[in-house]
């Protein structure tokens, strides 16, 4: 089977998506086509030999063939006409907006393309921390007290608390506020990325776990549960630099 790896996107997490695509090139032993989405949402067909970070940061990708989407998949335009690139199934590796918020899922569904990744409804729900909170409460999942603030509003929860842009991942824009002096700067940082901020009590020393899963027919396949090392909070650097450079260990969780 020929897989199309779609990565990049107009997102704050653009570079992480590139790193993910490079990683899947090493890990997935299959026929792969690499489809890069730049900040202007233009599509490019990338040669596997060019899959390295500086190829994209140097803008060399602009010399690659541009791709165009139609029913049936991506095609190239040339002097000999239109040519399909021949992909059986697409894998969505775009991080953040475009990839995780449902845009790419909706595009795949609209053009009747087979793809691996969350569907439109699941993407929309999970990309919003506020909607995820509401869903968790509806399903009876224990969750922290919270409030949602917009610009020109300030939290009412007692200190310390943690501020999280509602529609963003990778801990970007997240701040822990321990006293009133730290609040204005933390709000400026959060609202730089989103117009809506989720506020929760900050609990020092809380354990965090990673668990991946996917559905095969009626069954769910789950990975081992990993526990990343962190400092006060699991920030961007620890998620993608420190954690990526060390081997991950299965979390030690009691049955209780």
Regions found by a protein language model. Give the residues of each.
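Glycine-rich phosphate/pyrophosphate-binding beta-alpha loops
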Residues: 95-96, 171, 229-234
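Short, acidic/turn-prone active-site loops that include or flank metal/cofactor-
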Residues: 119-124, 227-230
């Amino acid at each position: 089977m020929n897989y199309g790896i779609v990565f990049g996107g107009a997102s704050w997490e653009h570079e992480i998506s590139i790193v993910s695509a490079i990683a899947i090139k090493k890990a997935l032993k299959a026929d792969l086509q690499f489809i890069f989405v730049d900040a202007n949402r233009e599509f490019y067909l990338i040669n596997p030999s060019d899959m390295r970070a500086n190829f994209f940061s140097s803008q060399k990708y602009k010399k690659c063939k541009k791709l165009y989407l139609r029913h049936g998949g991506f095609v190239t335009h040339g002097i000999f006409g239109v040519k399909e690139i021949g992909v059986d199934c697409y894998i969505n590796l775009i991080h953040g907006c475009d990839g995780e918020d449902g845009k790419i899922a909706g595009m795949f569904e609209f053009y009747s393309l087979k793809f691996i990744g969350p569907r439109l409804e699941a993407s929309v729900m999970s990309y919003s921390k506020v909607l995820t909170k509401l869903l968790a409460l509806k399903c009876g999942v224990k969750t922290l007290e919270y409030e949602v603030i917009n610009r020109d509003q300030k939290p009412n929860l007692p200190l310390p608390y943690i501020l999280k842009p509602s529609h963003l991942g990778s801990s970007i824009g997240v701040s822990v506020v321990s006293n009133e002096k730290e609040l204005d700067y933390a709000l400026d940082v959060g609202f730089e990325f989103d117009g809506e901020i989720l506020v929760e009590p900050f609990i020092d020393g809380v354990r965090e776990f990673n668990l991946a899963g996917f559905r095969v027919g009626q069954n769910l396949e789950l990975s081992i549960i990993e526990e990343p090392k962190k400092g006060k909070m699991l920030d961007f650097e620890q998620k993608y630099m420190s954690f990526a450079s060390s081997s991950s260990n299965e979390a030690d969780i009691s049955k209780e």
